């Protein structure tokens, strides 16, 4: 009976340790997931800013060229 109690106690102890390790790994994985989401949001924002910036510069460039052509021809 005593050996059975020892083996049950050993199994309980090993199960508790393995459960603790699994919880630590799970929490570490969740932390990494949040960081990946932050990175992806930043990259989306960065891409959108580049797109808007390029389009604004194109529009400003077209308006500037039209103004220069207008002034050169004295049609303004």
Swiss-Prot record:
Expressed by the skin glands. Keywords: Amphibian defense peptide, Antibiotic, Antimicrobial, Cleavage on pair of basic residues, Cytolysis, Disulfide bond, Fungicide, Hemolysis, Secreted, Signal. Residues 1-22 form the signal peptide. Residues 23-37 form a propeptide. It holds the Pfam family Antimicrobial_2. It comes from the Eukaryota. GO terms for biological process: defense response to bacterium; defense response to fungus; killing of cells of another organism. It is found in: Secreted. Its main location: secreted. Disulfide bonds join 70-76. InterPro entries: Antimicrobial_frog_2, Frog_antimicrobial_propeptide. Antimicrobial peptide active against a variety of Gram-positive and some Gram-negative bacterial strains. Has antifungal activity against a slime mold isolate. Has hemolytic activity against human erythrocytes. This is Esculentin-2CG1. It comes from Amolops chunganensis.
């Amino acid at each position: 009976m005593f050996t059975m109690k020892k083996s049950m106690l050993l199994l309980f102890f090993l199960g508790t340790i393995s459960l603790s390790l699994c919880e630590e790994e799970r929490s570490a994985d969740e932390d990494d997931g949040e960081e990946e989401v932050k990175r992806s949001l930043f990259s989306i924002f960065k891409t959108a800013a580049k797109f808007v910036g390029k389009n604004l510069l194109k529009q400003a460039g077209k308006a500037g060229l039209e103004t220069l052509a207008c002034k050169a021809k004295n049609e303004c």
